Amino acid sequence: MSRSSKKGAFVEASLYKKVLDMNAQQKKKIIKTWSRRSTIFPDFVGHTFAVHNGKKFINVYVTEDMIGHKLGEFSPTRTFKGHSSNR
């Protein structure tokens, strides 16, 4: 089941505050976050986030096409090694 539309999109409060502070100061530093569940808002466009994938941080540069998606969608947690070719 999806989230109720009357609740609105979720974003970590501390993460959103960091983005708003950086927008006010006109800075573009990398923002480190563990919050993969946060929704990308239009205020995030142009910022780079270091999103944790369980082992290390993956840099994610936010563009307009990413609005409405989650940060975790762009930081894969599993590595695919490929199928064996011994047949």
UniProtKB/Swiss-Prot annotation:
Residue stretches in coiled coil: none
Pfam families assigned: Ribosomal_S19
Keyword terms, alphabetized: Ribonucleoprotein, Ribosomal protein, RNA-binding, rRNA-binding
GO terms of biological process kind: ribosomal small subunit assembly; translation
Superkingdom as given in the UniProt entry: Bacteria
GO MF term list: rRNA binding; structural constituent of ribosome
Keyword RNA-binding attributed: yes
Gene3D superfamilies: 30s Ribosomal Protein S19, Chain A
Gene Ontology cellular component list: cytoplasm; small ribosomal subunit
Family to which the UniProt record says this protein belongs: Belongs to the universal ribosomal protein uS19 family.
Physiological role: Protein S19 forms a complex with S13 that binds strongly to the 16S ribosomal RNA.
PANTHER family per the UniProt record, alphabetical: RIBOSOMAL PROTEIN S19P FAMILY MEMBER, SMALL RIBOSOMAL SUBUNIT PROTEIN US19M
Protein name: Small ribosomal subunit protein uS19
Species of provenance: Mycoplasmoides gallisepticum (strain R(low / passage 15 / clone 2)) (Mycoplasma gallisepticum)
